[in-house]
């Protein structure tokens, strides 16, 4: 180990048979500011953004904090976030206006997801003449995507169709796709963690297939490269690299277990090989892949659909054997509302897992969460009413010092949700005049 090591490029990659392994930031790479390649000299690390979507709205009385500002108390649904409360903002009053009918009748679920990141009213069709708008993640990818191996990462836990009627005459693509590269080009999400892993770290050639057949760790194939690298690293860098490799190996072992275990039989759901039988483990495995992707700077932009809009997935492992969509239409029934609360609480617990994992990943004088913006929410306020104002939305992370978290902010009624997205783009040094129905930037985020 060398305490006076010669600097290495931030683009250093460890290579082996079918493997191309990017590295996290190390001291030997020089200042984080150089790694960030930012136009802002105050930026100390690359800023990342991720968008997590949950369907069917929330039980809002248990979502919205009663107090505003820094002295707010976490509501019952938000209680799992207690450990990272000072690193998130609950944002009330935001509206997805373009998810409203505008004369198109039913289809509130399809419009909710389609308009969530675009701020555009989707064309009502169950055919091929789909039309929406560019989503915020792809607006960002178009500007900074060439700085990383993958321009963006789109993942989820439920497959989606590119055609067919899934909601009152709206194409299934609208209920299952959050990312849109253009008005007519939706980006389907990947739901198999093994394939996501290979996208992040594989080379996509015949050697990769050979490595898969031998069922060895990717770390086995970069061992020689890593040994040569470690000889020039400080003690801190060696420890950080070891933690990074341990995270990769943990994910590999979890994927292997998922392939070997028999699937749990749930009505209308049979997970394919490589997908954990436990839904919680499935989500957390995907979360860990996002953390690795951001750590290694494989991408700086991610979307994660925890379940498709109008998903009727049951949650028997938390005592809810009814379908999610079914109980979201509670009609004021207290028993159904309690089931919705349980599902909402489960989803928030998974968000807490992601945020804590990011906050544990040290990066310079801060953490990965300090150098990111993680938006979480739904395009529906209350699943029983199918309304799209005052949405359940929160924003976590420090945005490289451009956000002042630890608060509950309430904005004026009908404030466009896309004003938040434009504000996030601004913090990525991406200036856009307008995105969808945006009317400006959100005040008070810093």
Protein language model features and the residues they cover:
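Ligand-binding pockets and gating/stacking loops
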Residues: 1-446
